[in-house]
Amino acid sequence: MAQQLPIRFSEVLQLASVGIQPSSFGFANVTLESDKYVCVRDNPNGVNQVVIVDLEDPSNVLRRPISADSVILHPKKKIIALKAQRQLQVFDLEAKAKINSYVMNQDVVYWTWISDSVIGMVTDTSVFHWTVSGSDPVKMFDRHSSLNGTQIISYKSNYNEEWFTLIGISSRDNRIAGNLQLYSKKRKVSQPLESHASAFAVIQPEGVDHEVQVLALASRLPTGSKLSIVEVDRNPNNPAFATKTVDLFFPPEAVNDFPIAIEIGSTYNVAYVVTKYGFIHVYDLETAKCIYMNRVSGESIFVTTAHKSVNGLMAINRKGQVLSVSINPETIIPYILSNLNDPGLAVRMASHANLPGADNLYMQQFQQLMAQGNYSEAAKVAASSPRGILRTSQVIDQFKLIQAAPGQIAPILQYFGTLLDKGPLNEHETIELARPVLAQNRIQLLEKWYGENKLACTEALGDLVKPYNTPFALKIYETANVPNKVVMCLSELGDFGKLATYTSQQNITPDYVSLLQNLVRVNPDQAAEFATQMFNSNPSINLEKIVDIFMSQNLVQQATAFLLDALKDDNPEHSHLQTRLLEINLINAPQVADAILGNQMFTHFDRAVIASLCERAGLVQRALELYDKPADIKRVIVHSNLLNPEWLMNYFSRFSPDEVYDYLREMLRSNLRQNLQIVVQIATRYSDLVGAQRIIEMFEKFKTFEGLYYYLGSIVNITEDPEVVYKYIQAACLMNQFTEVERICRDNNVYNPEKVKNLLKEAKLADQLPLILVCDRYDFVNDLVFYLFRNNMFQFIEIYVQRINPSKTPQVVGALLDIDCDEELVQNLLMSVVGQVPVDELVEEVERRNRLKLLLPYLESLLQSGSQDRAIYDALAKIYIDSNNNPEVFLKENNFYDTLTVGKYCEKRDPYLAFIAYEKGGNDTEIINLCNENSMFKQLARYLLKRSDSNLWSEVLQDSAYRRPLLDQVIATAVPESSDPEAVSIVVKALMEVDLPSQLIELLEKIVLQPSSFSENANLQNLLFLTAIKADKSRVMEYIDKLDKYDVDEIAEIAIENGLYEEAFRIYKIHNKHEQAMKVLVEDIVSLDRAQDYAETVEQPEVWSRLAKAQLDGIRIPDAIESYLKADDPSNYSEVIELASRAGKYEELIKYLLMARSKMHEPDVDSALLIAYAKTNQLTEMETFLIGSNVADVKAVGDECFESKNYEAAKLMYSSISNWSMLATTLVYLGEYQGAVDCARKANSIKVWKQVGTACIDKREFRLAQICGLNLIVHAEELPGLIRLYEERGYFEEVISLMEAGLGLERAHMAFYTELAILYAKYKPERMMEHLKLFWGRLNMAKVIRACDQMHLWNEAVFLYVHDQSYDNAAAVMMEQPEAFDHQSFKDIIVHVANLELYYRALNFYLEQHPMLLTDLLAALTPRIDHPRVIRIFEKSENTPLILNFMVAIQHLNIQAVNHAYNDLLIEMEDYQSLQDSIENYDHFDAIALARRLEKHSLLEFRRIAAYIYRKNKRWTQSIELSKQDRFYKDAIITARDSDQTTIAEDLMKYFVEIGNYECFAAILYTCYHLLRNDLVMEISWRKGLQDYAYPYFINFQCEMFSKVLNLEKDLKDRQAVKSEEESASTIGAGILGNTLMLTQGPMANNNDQFDSFQQASPMPRLGNF
């Protein structure tokens, strides 16, 4: 019955099986945009993840740590769209790149992919479309007001995105209402409708030319449920499509069910309507007829999509099942016919979807229309018949036989026209249509239909078309893939290029050489291309022959092109062809050869031969590349004017240093002027290789300083050899290249400066700039000044300091002063320098020579020019100090000198001037050292107070001899003089940091206790307190009485921290801070009695609260509660409840809690009061409390009472909050089982059902236990534990009764049926098979099979193995357990096993247990077993007679082992006739071995068979001897004839003569006539007188000889006639390729055998041979 269902239903995947949490199975977390991927937002272990499951490969699960509000995946690609609040992002997961992002200004409440590139997004007010490739979202339309307050569940568009539907649902009047907004993009209008689900579809109703676009709507309204199919966007060329509306059925129990989706099956033209509760409705789109309805999911469905691969739908339910539903193409048509009784629908669907099942209807309809003469309708029926059942040759013949009425189109043409309108023709139809079209010479019609893909291209069609149009036939052959006909057509058309391509693609090999020879004469270029393609497709072709073909026509270019492509792999075996290619081109086209060699395409040619040809052709460069001998190279290389310089330089890289040196010398020696430039370039490049010194010597040897200069100039900038640079400078001087000398001296870092300096001095150049540069760079300033001054070149000294390096002016001045130059000259030189002169160095140089005043004019000029160089002011300060020219004013007013330098300069001269300089510069360290050394403590104290630097104070207050006098000045002078609080505070901090409390107290008392500007300073008072607390606690109480500006809280806290509790208490008490005072009493002094007295004294609530907390901490709970009551303070209720509960003070606690309830409404307070009532057993007060208003956590209190086994109180609690689950458990403990079951039914909780059920089982309340159990067995995870509970207590009948009662449950699952089967196996095996037959499809086969194995239920085990398709196990059980064996079943099972070894195990089993059934088993296994192995098995056990029929059945396979065993069995049975048939028909056996065995057989016929075998295997002698032995002379004569050997035939003839059997003599003459020599026959006949027996032979021989002579005579005459004609004809020259002369094959050649026999017959008879 299951096979007759019109749908296919399967579970694609369990989301839980791929590790997704069940809590994630919902509309908000799961999206299903297509049948390719499921996308889930999961949260395992609190980690947000996005899980993508590939539905085509469920093991391919992709997890990404992504946090988002919503995720949708592209329908086809791994492109993911994420929404986090208003942030939208799209990522390509495979490319790992962001595609687009956007921030919305409204919240997106729903979104979905409406196409491959567009996401539809719905906000609270509008609908947007977002093209993710890069643009921003575009608003499409506004939401209709009817959708306000609804949850959007669907947004869809039609195929061209012109119509859209937006659906929202909401709760209204105790039902789920659906609202739909239909929007037209073209008209920009919306229409509101009441609907829950919708889908667009395109159909083509019967009789309508164009497609119709429809919209399917499903709704459930209070008045009824409807499915409507309406037309949208009507085509004006179509008739109007009538709206179809039908009732949508919902079962009575599905009160709250409603449609959630509609999916379209376009192939079948059906709509799948899915409801929330898992019902599927299948409707025909054209008629809106319901085809099928059923429930496919026990859990509610929340998302669906189209399952395109099967034209169905895919859905996901709350259990995480991914379900697939689709039409079953095999059963849908029979179902419609049998169940719906709607032939019209069946025919229409079968035609549209090409389905089986309606064939008879089509045939009946066709024959009926033909009989009525309605040929056009009959043609339509045939054209639309499913699977082409009516498009056959018989139907065509039927139409052809019908005569056309006058003036009407012939029926056969109507038929073909209908077929062409419907689609492409099949092969037979195409042929039948082509014949009349070609006969009318209207081939253009065929070409038109071919272009429209309406024809079925076959070889037969091509053969029909070829006589009319060869190019069109070529297309047909190509489409039909007929290679030989394609090659033929391409050859006829001359399209050899396409021919080569085609043959290469098709892997066929035509006669290429002939094709090439023809093509060379017609199109040489195309021939070259063809030859290349021919070689590429067949590399073994003879290349020499192809080259010869090209060269025979002197096609050098084409031959070259072919060889270049053919030899591109540069194989060694093609060396001769490489040489030939280069020879051809060097002779005919040297430039081509040059290009070939330049591209280095070949490496295996004869280098010597090609090099010589290159030299002759003027290709000097190529010749050099190929020559290896030095003599050849020297001969050619001197012609550098013919060579590319760059190439020549690279060419030298292949030589050793000595060879390079030799070739360069040869080039200079041969023609120095011509080759000098290239030699210099080569020498430059290979300088490191050959050695610069050798090259320098070479140029010097040839006395070419020009070459030396240019060579060294090219390497001087990169060399590290000082000698090379020196030689270059020397050569440049000789070549008068002074600019280059200057550049090298300025920029080069390699040369020896001393050596170059001496060279330049000796050269006495007119321009001393190079010398100046060398001396400046290497600090030879003194030498330079001395040289220039002594040689009266003072102008170059001026040039040096003015233009070259003004920074060296100090050294120049120093050198001039050292040689006693006139000071005026030096001052003038200084005044002439306009560059930046380092004044500090200049001052140092002059000061070292005690000539500082010399600089005064220069320095003052710099000062007047506005220079602010510090060195100038330093120098002026020193001059003013030494000259005592008002230095104090200068030091105080000037801000540009270096205070450190000047102060250091003044320290020994005048400390006060040094202090001024240091103070101006803030040089703290120097001032400290200066004042300490000179006892200037008063100045230092004032300076420190002014500086207000804590670090500086830390430094001076370090323990030293200077600290005490400094502090005295600070306390006595500096601080009293100061009015800056910040400065004083820094001093105080400094004293604190260095821990000088006595001095600090002394300082503070002076400025705080005594009248001063700091007396009222709170910070200083605080500091005084702090210092006293740390250093002298006895003064603290005195300060409390004297001071009043200090920070009370801070000082009190510090006093407490330092143990001065009484002082702290006094501070708080004086300042009326009673709460803090109480805190000191209870926490620090720890005197609760004093605290009690103090609280009674002050009578303040906060004081009582503080006291109560202390009493509570001291576990004086009644006192604490009393204090809290006096304070009227419930704030600390949590701690009071905890401690009072722990101490069991519930009576006191009740008073406190009642006070607290009057002040606040806290759940903890009310809960604690309930607990207190429970603990004091005040159930009446508790019940009153529960009836009244309260905020207690009743469940938690009830749980606590339950845990403490106070079940009566717990019962009250749970009853008040209707907590049926816990109430049921409580009633169990109270023994009220019926009430417990009633509560469990209300709770409907698995845990409760388990608890109540367990209690009922323990109390043997099996009726109640069954009620509980029925609610548990529907949960697979609870079932094993429940069964184990019954089994452990021995209640087997009861558990089986429970399970049987659950068989009718709607939610019965696989585990349920499986466990019931196991129970039957254990306790009621007699009912096991019945259960298996009914429910085998809903069992866990593996578990039930294990149970059957354990309980030895072998028949049941076999049944399960078969239905589980575990045929191997089923067969094994049947062989191992006799009671499970059934021959017929075993035959059906064994043919399906996967383990082939079971075949042979079964054969052995049958051989041992059921030998008479072996033949039947072998018949079933024949196609599957290894026949030689079977034969070996039975041969080994000597049971081959049992399988005789098997061997006969398979002998046609001609297997050696089978033939051998069969023949042995026939010999054993002495059945020679069957043996003869076997040997004649099947030759795969060891014939010689069988013959040797048979020739010794006792029966004559077997020996005759042995002779036959010998004859068949060409053992002629052995066969004849065996035949002679048994006197089978006829067999012997036949053997001699078959041997075709004269010796064997003559020996047998002699044997017959010897034994006197003349009849056999005559017989052999006739039979072996062609083997016997005539002379021998005549001799034997004459000697033995056997002429009468031999005369027939002689007569025939003479006749044959006469015929041969006549033929020879005729042949001779014909030859003479031909020879005469040839002599008279003109001579034809030899062919291009030098073809040799071939002999004409005349009649003589056809009679060689007769001619040979004639020659053998000519000599005289040879007597004496007999």
UniProtKB/Swiss-Prot annotation:
The modification Phosphoserine is found at residue 393. This is Probable clathrin heavy chain. Residues 195-255 are annotated as: WD40-like repeat 5. It is found in: Cytoplasmic vesicle membrane; Membrane, Coated pit. Residues 256-299 are annotated as: WD40-like repeat 6. It is a peripheral membrane protein. The modification Phosphothreonine is found at residue 392. PROSITE patterns: CHCR. It comes from Schizosaccharomyces pombe (strain 972 / ATCC 24843) (Fission yeast). One of its GO terms (cellular component) is clathrin complex. Clathrin is the major protein of the polyhedral coat of coated pits and vesicles. Residues 149-194 are annotated as: WD40-like repeat 4. GO terms for molecular function: clathrin light chain binding; structural molecule activity. Residues 300-328 are annotated as: WD40-like repeat 7. Clathrin triskelions, composed of 3 heavy chains and 3 light chains, are the basic subunits of the clathrin coat. Keywords: Coated pit, Cytoplasmic vesicle, Membrane, Phosphoprotein, Repeat. Pfam families: Clathrin (PF00637), Clathrin-link (PF09268), Clathrin_H_link (PF13838), Clathrin_propel (PF01394). CHCR repeats lie at residues 534-680, 683-825, 830-969, 975-1120, 1124-1265, 1270-1415, 1418-1561. Residues 108-148 are annotated as: WD40-like repeat 3. One of its GO terms (biological process) is Golgi to endosome transport. It comes from the Eukaryota. Residues 24-67 are annotated as: WD40-like repeat 1. The C-terminal third of the heavy chains forms the hub of the triskelion. This region contains the trimerization domain and the light-chain binding domain involved in the assembly of the clathrin lattice. The N-terminal seven-bladed beta-propeller is formed by WD40-like repeats, and projects inward from the polyhedral outer clathrin coat. It constitutes a major protein-protein interaction node. Residues 68-107 are annotated as: WD40-like repeat 2. InterPro entries: ARM-type_fold, CHCR, Clathrin_H-chain/VPS_repeat, Clathrin_H-chain_linker_core, Clathrin_H-chain_N, Clathrin_H-chain_propeller_rpt, Clathrin_heavy_chain, TPR-like_helical_dom_sf.
